[in-house]
């Protein structure tokens, strides 16, 4: 996805990364509308998350990405702790959470993460970090990875 874009959602990784925060914030109202629908806990097919579960995932993803961004800015080439998103969904009982609470929490987390990316300047965009599986990121590529996740889940997975 970071090399050629996403054919499913149309994400182009060659966007201006300084707009990451603005674009992330632009999803908040659409996520709120998704969580206001009937059937938000319905899974479209076995093994596929419901809209509520995707919203919980994006909320938690924001927390994880914000912490990883902080590490990239504060440390030299940090290695990120693993995050098992499927285990997080089970442990957090995503599909049993209150959609109105999730909506507020998601908005807060998206905005906080957007603010964190807004604070990145100049040479900080070139700082590096790595996932436990060895995948390397710069802050710029990490921003694109984050934004793609948020926008893809909204456009493709929950049709928001």
Segments predicted by a language model, with ranges:
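Terminal targeting/low-complexity segments that flank the catalytic cores of oxidoreductases
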Residues: 1-26
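Short, contiguous alpha-helical
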Residues: 1-3, 40-89, 123-160
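Short amphipathic alpha-helical segments at helix-loop
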Residues: 12-16, 50, 91-98, 134-138
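General structural signal for secondary-structure boundaries
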Residues: 15-20, 35-38, 84, 97-98, ...
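Hydrophobic alpha-helical segments and helix-packing faces
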Residues: 17-20, 24, 47-51, 58, ...
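A glycine-rich, hydrophobic loop/mini-helix early in the fold
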Residues: 22-49
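Acidic/histidine-rich alpha-helical segments that form the ligand environment
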Residues: 24-27, 31-34, 88-127, 146
